[in-house]
């Protein structure tokens, strides 16, 4: 069946497991200003972290989260990373600075087609990409590197 355009309106949520629910909530609240919603203290403890209107992380606490994820990767899939888009360049810079302060990010910012992007990790080691659309008249207040997608050769230097 071929349907065009894709009949999906948005990503509603991404489900994650963590061995420390409170630590993960603190990280997303502090770094991204995310709102923690609908805490449930039963077994397993869980909550939603609101990222944008209609998009959230659904996080479940599981003491053996890393071990269980590795053991069941082929049963339930895995995730390499997810990307969050900053609304404004100033927000991108502020989040980058907080990630640097927490030592959760490579300080490298990439100049990719149409966006500036960086990669960081959350307290459980999940890779997060943060990007901001390139805008006329705004230049990042730090050096950037040209982004080279995996599998493509880097262009020769000057």
Where are these regions (language model features)?
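Short beta-strand/turn micro-motifs at beta-sheet edges
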Residues: 1-4, 67-72
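Hydrophobic pocket/interface hotspot
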Residues: 24, 28, 82, 99
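A short, acidic/glycine-rich surface segment
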Residues: 64-70, 106, 138
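Core segments of cupin and vicinal oxygen chelate
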Residues: 6, 16-64
């Amino acid at each position: 069946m071929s349907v065009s355009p894709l009949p999906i309106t948005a990503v509603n949520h991404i489900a994650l497991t963590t061995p420390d629910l409170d630590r993960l909530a603190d990280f997303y609240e502090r770094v991204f200003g995310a709102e923690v919603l609908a805490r449930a203290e039963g077994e397993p403890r869980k909550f939603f972290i609101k990222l944008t209107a209609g998009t959230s992380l659904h996080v479940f606490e599981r003491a053996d989260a890393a071990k269980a994820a590795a053991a069941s990767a082929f049963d339930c899939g895995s995730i390499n990373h997810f990307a969050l888009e900053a609304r404004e360049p100033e927000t991108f810079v502020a989040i980058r600075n907080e990630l640097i302060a927490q030592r959760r990010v490579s300080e490298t910012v990439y100049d990719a087609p149409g966006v500036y992007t960086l990669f960081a990790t959350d307290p459980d080691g999940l890779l997060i990409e943060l990007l901001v659309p390139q805008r006329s008249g705004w230049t990042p207040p730090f050096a950037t590197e040209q982004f080279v997608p995996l599998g493509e050769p880097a262009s020769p230097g000057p």
